[in-house]
Amino acid sequence: MDFVSRDRISSLPNPVVSHILSFLPTKEAASTSVLSKKWRYLFAYVTNLDFDDSDYQDGKPKSDVELSRSFMEFVDRVLALQGNGSVNKFSLECSNYDVDLARVTGWILNVLGRGVSELDLSILEYPLPSEIFVSKTLVRLKLGPANDLTLTLDRKDVFLPKLKTLYIDCVDVQERGFGFVKLLSGCPVLEELVLMNIGWENWKFCSVSVKTLKRLTFFCEETYENPKSVSFDTPNLVYLEYSDAIASKYPKVNFNSLVEAHIGLRLTEDQSGDADFSEEDYFSEGDEKKQMVGNATDFLKGISTVQILYLSAQAIEVLTFCCEPIPVFNNLIQLTIENNSEIRWDSLPGLLKNCPNLETLVLKRLLHKYNKACGNVCCCKRPKQPSCLSSSPVKVLKIFLFDDNDEEDGSEMRQIKYFLEKMPRLEELVVYYNTAYDPAVLELSKKLQKIPKIASPKCKIQVISENLSLSSTVPSFLTTRWSSLPPEEAYPWVDSPPPQIIDPMLEYGSPPEDDDSWLY
């Protein structure tokens, strides 16, 4: 290959080369200026600026002061070179305490004056300049994560007329809830809001009131206290992620347009202690009322129009001890439930009864803490009354099994058998098995094919793993393998090429008579 064919980029029009350089970190983009005189001046037209002081560790021993000086001089030179040219995106990350905050403010004011539309700031111990919150050009604003990045709204005018995305992570919002309300009220066209680790358990209230909002992520790590009051007035919201300790009260919950919700509500340590998961304390053969340790009923009623719902294991716990009665989810067509060995299924019978139009049920693990209260949907103790599963409208059941639970007593297989015995409308059972060990997948498929499908004789059964997809009918694989796939974080192989297709019925033949031999 000759030089001409290898240097095709240089032959591109200058605006195209500048656009390509905009996708590089600014330090790397600047280094291309030594390639030729033409490239030296092209760098001045890059519209995306990305500065990170950690990029200045060049292998030579330098003090923090020296590194900070090199970093600040570089940023100064770049901004001076560009003059008053327009800026699309400005990203600045400063993790070194020796960076001069006055110069940082100057950089931010520089790009604000040049009409920046995306601003991404992560700066240690930095009070954000108020000029950010009256920008007429910002479309996306990301603040944090950083320790002691402070948002002080000490002026009356907060107005971001074009802002559509606001991302706040580990930012200290002054004036507590009032400052936060002031910020949101100044964003008249906001569509996406991400709130990460704000730590508002000490606020008097938190209110998210944005009529134009379509997507909301509300996440806070483990806290020792319950937020006092949380309200949502977002009538056009279609997507919600909410993970936090339950609030003491939810005065207003307006999710009239909600389509999909991922709920990770949890009890605090004190509430978990009060709940005391001992069944002899709160449950008996009679139907003794369990103790409520909080109240999330108003919030759950507020999301009852949702169509797709994901509940974490902790949220199932909240349903049990903080919701009475469980609301009716008339629009719900897909429900995903996460389980673990410490969570009970007490609330599942009531939840499933109140999902009259549910089509797809997804269970991440089947292990849970057994007791008599979950017997309506569980095989651990056969209920005296008919199971709510007998009237279940579910057509597709998806189960995620993991090879790390050392489960050797057959309880998960018995639970699957119980589902097949009780769910009359079931058309498809898909088991995602997180293992690369093919013989284990084959053995699981063999056991599943032997289960008598009493309530759903026409139910198709599939087992999908990293390398194999085993199906009772091969055509069903072709339509399901690439439809609703398991989460990427648990199953990174789902984007790989299709695995080998095997019809286990050809290998194993018809199922034997109903007995327990298929378990072992």
Swiss-Prot record:
Listed A to Z, the keywords are: Leucine-rich repeat, Repeat
Please give the superkingdom of this protein's source: Eukaryota
Q: Name one Pfam family in it.
A: LRR_At5g56370
Stretches forming LRR repeats:
170-197, 219-244, 340-365
Q: Does the keyword tRNA processing apply?
A: no
Q: Which SMART domains does this UniProt record tie to the protein?
A: FBD
Q: Which residue range or ranges hold the F-box domain?
A: 6-54
Q: InterPro entries, from UniProt?
A: F-box-like_dom_sf, F-box_AtFBL13-like, F-box_dom, FBD, FBL60-like, LRR_dom_sf, LRR_FXL15/At3g58940/PEG3-like
PANTHER family the UniProt entry points to: RNI-LIKE SUPERFAMILY PROTEIN
The protein's name is: F-box/LRR-repeat protein At3g59200
Q: State the taxonomy lineage.
A: Eukaryota, Viridiplantae, Streptophyta, Embryophyta, Tracheophyta
